[in-house]
Amino acid sequence: QDMFRLSGIHRDVYLVASPKVRLRDIHLTSQISDRLDKAELKVKTDVHNYGKKVQEATVRVSLLNTEGKPVSSFIIPTGKITGGQENVCEGTTTIRDPRLWSAETPSLYTVQLELLDAAGNVLEATSQQYGFRKIEIRNNKVYINNALILFKGANRHDIHPQFGKAVPVESMIEDILLFKRFNLNTIRTSHYPNDPKMYSLYDYYGLYVMDE
């Protein structure tokens, strides 16, 4: 393949300290109505009990709009979690007239999750930005939010002329702004996944991604 192969640790490596009961994984999906006037957000969480005793908790989910104002909040009970096991917990909420994400209007909501113990104390908190979008294929053509999309893009290698594969965030942003100035709306991550931080930047600045 047309790339340089470099050895060593070139992306973030870190340890995570967590409570014995924690949010091990979070999965967000949504359904947009045909008229684009309603969005249903589905939150799926894997809550793991790393301790030995049976535990029970709740997950509090808050949805904030693009200005950071709360538009919805709901509770997901975890049920009793046996020591060393995890429960898969799901919940949904619906909002009216969502601001939809596209490459031209990259509107991002914030989904906040808090894991609460039986006494209501916060054990863990995390957040994830999320863009509501409706993606369809009709007659071999791609529609996003009911609009026909022409993908204009380029390949991108995750590499820097000075730092190799340890690409600084400033260089990532510089690449994205260059793509936008050239009126591109799509990036193909040839031939491997980009640094995880890149996907947050793609969402923030508004670029479609063909991920390899």
Model-based region annotation:
Residues Q1-P196, L201-V209:
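Secreted/periplasmic carbohydrate-active enzymes, especially glycoside hydrolases
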